[in-house]
C-alpha cells in the first residue's frame, strides 16, 4: 500500500481531494490484483449454472484472474505463464455430446466426454491453485511497476466497454469456443450413456435362443410408439375396409337355364345291321323296293 502511494513530501503538498483520489487508485490496484471488490462477479458466481453439472472436471473450478494483453501493453512474463498454462490444460480429452429425442418430441442433450485420470481429482485442483497464485503475483508486480491509471492500462474495444474483467474474459472464451448457449441449457445432470453393454452371462446363455413371438411384440410395440405424423392406425384402417365389405349390396341372382329335351337319335350298328338284313330278305323273295334311290337306265 505504501509503495503505491506517492512520497511523503508530495503527499503533504497534496489537497484532501487529491489524497482521496490517490488512495482510491492504490486500493483499486490491490483489489484488481487479488480479484476482489467486483460485486457483479460475486453475483454471477451465486447464479445457477446448468453447464456446471455436466462439466468435465468434478466440482467448481477456481476463477483464474488472467491478465488481458493488448497491443500497447507488453509483458514477457505473463505471456510465458499463459502459454505454459495452456500447455498444461491441453490434455487428451475426447469431447462428445449426444442429442436424443424422446417419443413425445422432447430434446435431450447429454455430455459424455471422456477425461484422463491426471486431469481429475486433487492434482488438477492443486495445479490450478498454483497457477492462480503465480498469475496473481505477476499481476501485482506489474501493478507495482506501472505508474499510469487503470483506465489507461485497460483499453478494451468499444463493444466490451462497461463490463468487468471476468465478464470480458468469459465473453472472449465463449467467442473462441463457438458453442451455442441453448445446448448448455439443455444439458442435464443424469448423463445416460448412448450404449449399455449386455451382461456376459446372459449373452452366452441366450445366444442360441430367440423367442420370435416376444421379438415380434417388441417390434410391434416400438412401431406403435413411434409413428409418422399423419399416419393412420392400421388396425382402424383394416376394420374400416371390413365394414365396407360387409355393407356391400348382395349380387343379383342369375336367370335359371330352361332345359329343352333333344329327340335326335344317333344311328348305331344295330340299326344298320337290321337294314341290311331286310334288304337281303327282299332280294331273296323278289320284292321290288317301293322307291328306287336312282333311276334305272335301259340296258
UniProtKB/Swiss-Prot annotation:
- Would the keyword Cytoplasm turn up in this protein's UniProt record? yes
What is its subcellular localisation?
Answer: Cytoplasm; Cell projection, Cilium; Cytoplasm, Cytoskeleton, Microtubule organizing center, Centrosome, Centriole
TM regions (residue ranges): none
| Entry keywords, A to Z | Cell projection, Cilium biogenesis/degradation, Cytoplasm, Cytoskeleton, Phosphoprotein
Residues bearing Phosphoserine are: 179
Q: GO CC terms for this protein?
A: centriole; cilium; cytoplasm; non-motile cilium
Q: Which InterPro entries match?
A: Centriolar_ciliogenesis_assoc, HYLS1, HYLS1_C_dom
GO BP annotations listed:
cilium assembly
Q: Does the keyword Nucleotidyltransferase apply?
A: no
The family this protein is said to belong to: Belongs to the HYLS1 family.
The role this protein plays is:
Plays a role in ciliogenesis.
Q: What is this protein called?
A: Centriolar and ciliogenesis-associated protein HYSL1
Whose protein is this, by species? Macaca fascicularis (Crab-eating macaque)
Amino acid at each position: 500500500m505504501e509503495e503505491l502511494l506517492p512520497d511523503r513530501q508530495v503527499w503533504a503538498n497534496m489537497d484532501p481531494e487529491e489524497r482521496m483520489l490517490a488512495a482510491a487508485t492504490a486500493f483499486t490496484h490491490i483489489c484488481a490484483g487479488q480479484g476482489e471488490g467486483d460485486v457483479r462477479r460475486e453475483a454471477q458466481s451465486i447464479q445457477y449454472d446448468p453447464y456446471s453439472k455436466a462439466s468435465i472436471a468434478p466440482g467448481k473450478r477456481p476463477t483464474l484472474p488472467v491478465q488481458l494483453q493488448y497491443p500497447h501493453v507488453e509483458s514477457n512474463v505473463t505471456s510465458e505463464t499463459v502459454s505454459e498454462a495452456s500447455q498444461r490444460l491441453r490434455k487428451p480429452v475426447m469431447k462428445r455430446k449426444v442429442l436424443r429425442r424422446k417419443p413425445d418430441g422432447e430434446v435431450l442433450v447429454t455430455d459424455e466426454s471422456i477425461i484422463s485420470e491426471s486431469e481429475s481429482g486433487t492434482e488438477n485442483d492443486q495445479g490450478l491453485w498454483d497457477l492462480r497464485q503465480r498469475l496473481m503475483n505477476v499481476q501485482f508486480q506489474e501493478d507495482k511497476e506501472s505508474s499510469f491509471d487503470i483506465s489507461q492500462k485497460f483499453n478494451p474495444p468499444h463493444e466490451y466497454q462497461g463490463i468487468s474483467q471476468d465478464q470480458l474474459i468469459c465473453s472472449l472464451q465463449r467467442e473462441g469456443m463457438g458453442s451455442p448457449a441453448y445446448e448448455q441449457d439443455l444439458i442435464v445432470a443424469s448423463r445416460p450413456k448412448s450404449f449399455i453393454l449386455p451382461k456376459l452371462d446372459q449373452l452366452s446363455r441366450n445366444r442360441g435362443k430367440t423367442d420370435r413371438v416376444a421379438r415380434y411384440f417388441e417390434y410391434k410395440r416400438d412401431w406403435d410408439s413411434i409413428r409418422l405424423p399423419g399416419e393412420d392406425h392400421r388396425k382402424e384402417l383394416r376394420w374400416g375396409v371390413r365394414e365396407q365389405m360387409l355393407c356391400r349390396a348382395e349380387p343379383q341372382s342369375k336367370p335359371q337355364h330352361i332345359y329343352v329335351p333333344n329327340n335326335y337319335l344317333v344311328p348305331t350298328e344295330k340299326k344298320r345291321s337290321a337294314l341290311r338284313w331286310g334288304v337281303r330278305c327282299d332280294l331273296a323273295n323278289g320284292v321290288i323296293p317301293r322307291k328306287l334311290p336312282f333311276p334305272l337306265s335301259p340296258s
